[in-house]
Amino acid sequence: MTITRRDFINAGVTAAAGAALTPTLLHGDSALPTPSRAARPIVVSSANGLRGVKVAYDKIVAREDTLDAIIAGVNIQELDPEDQSVGLGGLPNEEGVVQLDASCMHGPTKRAGAVGCLEDIATPSLVAKAVMDYTDHIMLVGPDAKRFAVNMGFKTQNLLTEKSRQDWLRWKARLNKGDNWLDHDDDVRIKFTHGTINMNAVNAAGDISSVTTTSGRAWKVAGRVGDSPIVGAGEYCDNEVGAAGSTGRGEANIKVCGAFLAVEFMRQGKSPQEAVMQVIQRVIAMTEKRLLDPNGRPLFDLEFYALTKDGRYAGASCYEGGKFAVCDDKGARLEDCGFMYKRDQRPKMP
């Protein structure tokens, strides 16, 4: 039988339409889970969000939108000059410039927004939400992200606090023994952070949101963007399933799209704990040899946090000792992360 070009194209269109209408093709042999209402409102965050989860939870109980609530929660850290991992006072890049990244996702509307390499604006999470609310785009970066923020009414300020500037100068002095910078304060330990805050929430109606915000890796190459502003890596939510996010070495997470992967594992029926632990296994499997010790263990840490539509939650890290923040009707608290390796198996971190 001879097949014409038109027959071939029509057959392809028909097959594509059929595939689009068959959700089981995306999930192996199992059908999509039946959506359920949340058992209770709950907020889950990285450990540095302990104050923020309480703020977010109270707003959710007061029937505020889940995304507005968790952004208000992370704003606490963004505006705290003593927190050197996000926002105002965040540790700068190698040029001494604070560059911020953030992304957010709103489950009920299936919308998202993000900014990367944003300078002089202390609350990148709010700018990311403005990108979501007022544009047809998802991500804006660099000077144009700042221009957008200023046009939207955000106020500029110098984000480099004196404390962070002094840490940067100490790092710069010790960078190269043969340079022209004199070393001082030998007894002062220089911080080297991958600091970030991720927060996820579900309300009593089962609506879910997620946000991640960061100043990124301390002393990074100017222009570096990690996983935080990448929807599907630094954070992700699906209103029918749950949400997930991460903190730690962003480069390791980007390669596995960790937040998306965790949500997909939960869609398949895995518990939040099983999902985030399986993501960490995938991260380690995808790690290049130079970042592994002789026993195949990572020379970095990475944490994931996840919750489901019905209010189950978990946190996980590569090594024992990690904590994450939770708030529900029992109050705000820190809980232990699940882990891949025990504390005494941790190699010396670079």
Kindly give the residue locations of the regions a language model identified.
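C-terminal binding/interaction regions
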Residues: L100, K110-K191, I280-G315, E320-V326, ...
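Extended C-terminal subregions enriched in glycine
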Residues: R249-G296, E303
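N-terminal secretory signal peptides and thylakoid transit peptides that target proteins
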Residues: M1-A16
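Glycine-rich anion/phosphate-binding loop at the beta-strand->alpha-helix junction
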Residues: R147-V150, F154-V241
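Active-site- and interface-proximal helix/loop "cap" or "latch" segments in soluble metabolic
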Residues: S45-G49, K59-L67, G226-P272
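C-terminal segment of N-terminal export signals and the immediately downstream linker at the start
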Residues: P23-K54
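Active-site-adjacent structural elements in enzyme catalytic domains
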Residues: R40, R51-K59, T66-D136, L140-R147
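Short beta-strand scaffold segments in enzyme catalytic cores
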Residues: L88, D101-C104, I197-V202, I208-S210, ...
